[in-house]
Amino acid sequence: FKPTLKKYNKYIAPFLNIKNPFDEENPLEEKIIGTSKDYVNKILRAAFPDIIPDSTGYSIREEIDKENPLGPNIWRELDSFILPNFVTEKEYCEEKISRVGMKKIKNSDERKSIWDYIENIFTEWDKENIQYTEYVCYKLIQKIENGEYKIPEKLKTDYLLVDDAQDLSATTLRLMRATVRKSMILTYDKEQAVFQPSCIWNRAGIDISRNLINLNINFRSTNQINEVAEKYRATIKGANKENLPKTFRLGPPVELHENKNQDDSFAQMISTVRMCINSLNYKPEDICIIESSYGDLSELSEKLKNELDLDSAYVDDSEFDFSDIIIRLAGTQNCKGLDFPIVLFYLNDFTSFSQFGIKQFDNATIDIMNRNMIYTAITRSIEMLHVFTLSDSTAAPINDLKAILKTETK
């Protein structure tokens, strides 16, 4: 899903004797490994050669924003519900499809009027050569299912493995499914859904009810890390209770560091990094510092350089390469799918999670996604996990983790 994983897979491919996993010269040719964006875009380009899909955002006339029944909230309704779930006009206006997980909005009962303005947005987008990717997927699926378009055979595959499928919208998965002749294999962890509430598979036209296998061996983490992670996962509402992964490696206990302020937390992180490198003989590239609010580690990065002469960079920086001998920095979203021998997790501010664009969901859904982010971060660690928090935190997702760690260390 994330370009970071593409870089990571490119880095590890030679170790697995995989040559040229990405064919940048011939984007329509078959690839062994690729991102969902790459895969979907080649389908969209073939269907709409004059359209440039744009996944970063979109523009529209201001009067639509002002005059429709939802005001600015129409973008959230469109971007977080209608487009990603492939909701049709009939479902929205006549069948009154439930907006599960979405925050209640004013005038939401005026569905026909809302849809009319959404159609206006579609009309405006269709006039542009740069169009929002999710919308281009949406209208291509309509053409395919109405018999107006067939995906070329050269863009189809017999089998397709989609990793971290919970991060993809139902619309994206529905389009990808249309390219598969035989079987689509999905790997997913509902408790690691950090970009959207977990996908509703039937919206993607996929039935997993009779073909579901729980993987119950954790090859990544130590017993100690796995035990903390599983106890925390149990605090997530609706967590999969049948999936109880087992581990087989011993390691040091997970450590909790509570501090009064950020300066004290950074000082302890510097001390921990120094210990890992000078005393335990780890290398800088073995260490990843994960933060809950993206962009807060610039000061720490300077301290690492000034006090320990260690360079660091965010894993999603365009210039970063996994072969770089530097400390890794990451947010709770862009660490997905990665693993590191040592993780220092800086949980400083619960309110920072709002920056991930989850304000459109109701409080129960936001709580689940916040906990998913924490669970994802702590499960990136292979051997050592240190958690740094502020002592006066009042946020339930953070305090629940602190309570677990305090019990573990008694």
Task: Label each region the model flagged.
Residues 137-140, 151-152:
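Long C-terminal extensions of eukaryotic subunits of large macromolecular complexes
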